[in-house]
Structures are given as C-alpha cells and as structure tokens.
C-alpha cells in the first residue's frame, strides 16, 4: 500500500475540497490519461485496485504512471468511544483529488486498449473520470 515513509506531523486537519486542479492536470509522460471530473478522496487501496485493473488488461504491453500519492492521514476513533479525549489514531492515507487532476497515464498501447483499461479502472474509483489524449485540449 502507498503511504508516506515519514511525515513531519502525524495527524492533519480535515480541510475542504474546493475549486479545480491546476497542477497535475496535463499529461506529463504518457499518450493517454485518466482525468478526474469531480472532487473526492482516493485511498491507497483504491489507487492500487485501479492500477491492478489497468496492468492486468494491458498485460505486458504499455507503460503505466501513477500520478497521485496518498499523503493525507485520516484518523478514526474506536467503536463505542465517548466524544472527547482527543483525536483518534491514523487509520489510512488518502490522496485529495480535485476536478481536472490526471490520476493515471498510459503509453505504448492503442486507443481502444487504453479506453477499455481506463474504463475498468474507473469502476474501482469513487470519483467520476474521463479519458484524455495527448494533443487534445484538456
């Protein structure tokens, strides 16, 4: 599972997801990309499940880049615990996704294979996505 090796602070505030992504919204390496069209949070398990779906479909062909990393800790209190007594323990890490963010990039495959692979991956993700190609306006 993806998570930071070490962090400056153990816990983080909840925050809000507003606006759209300006950084990470263009294709950097691949010919095709999977771009988020709404905001949300991706856990390391969801990122890994989508990666496995893509790599299993394209098999040995193509190169895949993961463009997001879960660096925000999410805390949770134990069940049947009274309120108060501080913030809960870190349970998992998430990547905060804004609309326009490219999640995955793919190269070395044809158009139909990339579309099908990203379609399979999109079913594993909690945010709406679309496929983008290099050269088209994003």
Curated annotation (Swiss-Prot):
Record's protein name: Large ribosomal subunit protein uL16
Signal peptide residue numbers: none
GO MF annotation terms: rRNA binding; structural constituent of ribosome; tRNA binding
Function description: Binds 23S rRNA and is also seen to make contacts with the A and possibly P site tRNAs.
Subunit organization: Part of the 50S ribosomal subunit.
GO cellular component: cytosolic large ribosomal subunit
Record-stated family: Belongs to the universal ribosomal protein uL16 family.
Domain of life where this protein originates: Bacteria
Biological process according to GO: translation
InterPro entries with a match to the protein in the record: Ribosomal_uL16 (IPR047873), Ribosomal_uL16_bact-type (IPR000114), Ribosomal_uL16_CS (IPR020798), Ribosomal_uL16_dom (IPR016180), Ribosomal_uL16_sf (IPR036920)
The keyword Ribonucleoprotein is annotated on this UniProt entry: yes
Keyword list, A-Z: Ribonucleoprotein, Ribosomal protein, RNA-binding, rRNA-binding, tRNA-binding
UniProt xrefs under Pfam families: Ribosomal_L16 (PF00252)
Organism, scientific name: Anaeromyxobacter sp. (strain K)
């Amino acid at each position: 599972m993806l998570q930071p090796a070490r962090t400056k602070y153990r816990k983080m505030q909840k925050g809000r997801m507003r606006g759209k992504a300006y950084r990470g919204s263009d294709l950097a390496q691949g010919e095709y990309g999977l771009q988020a069209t709404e905001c949300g949070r991706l856990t390391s398990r969801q990122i890994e499940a989508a990666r496995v779906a893509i790599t299993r479909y394209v098999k040995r062909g193509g190169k895949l880049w993961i463009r997001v990393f879960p660096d925000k800790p999410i805390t949770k209190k134990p069940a049947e615990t009274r309120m108060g007594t501080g913030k809960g323990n870190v349970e998992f890490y998430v990547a905060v996704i804004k609309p326009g963010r490219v999640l995955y990039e793919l190269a070395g495959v044809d158009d139909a294979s990339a579309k099908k692979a990203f379609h399979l991956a999109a079913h594993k993700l909690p945010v709406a996505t679309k496929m983008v190609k290099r050269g088209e306006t994003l």
